[in-house]
Amino acid sequence: MKTISLVYISLSGNTESFVTRLKDYLLSQYKRIEVQKIHIKDLVKEGKNFYEMDHPYVAFLPTYLEGGNGVDNGDVEILTTPVGDFIAYGNNASKCFGVVGSGNRNFNNQYCLTAKQYSQRFGFPVLADFEMRGMLEDIKHVAAIIADLYELEKEN
């Protein structure tokens, strides 16, 4: 049995929706897996300490910024910084396969900017991106990436 860990934060419900649908899709398509959702907001809200991951994971990060346009006059990450703190804890950054960014394309250059910044900060790739709650095609695309990373076997 392989454990797939999805580390994320959801503030408006969009990322929660995507990660939940992704979990359901993975469980329906691949055998001998369990999918663990780790919602950083819940850890913070419940006052739980961050911990070191003992196996690889994929991070999911929405974009919440204030100030600037994200390109030539700056930006400030807001609300999602606990994810960065979790990734920075112990050796967690080295266990992260990469980040999946989300956002709203209406914000142009700021779309998925936080995921791109985490990629640079921690040295792992941006694996994919999706807008708002994501579509079924986004779920399938991210699931295929996860299947490759974890070397999963199809359910057929």
Curated annotation (Swiss-Prot):
SUPFAM superfamilies per the UniProt record, alphabetical: Flavoproteins
GO MF, any single term: FMN binding
One biological process term in Gene Ontology: protein modification process
One Pfam entry name: Flavodoxin_NdrI
NCBIfam families from the UniProt entry: PRK02551.1
Name of protein: Putative NrdI-like protein
Species this protein is from: Streptococcus pneumoniae (strain ATCC BAA-255 / R6)
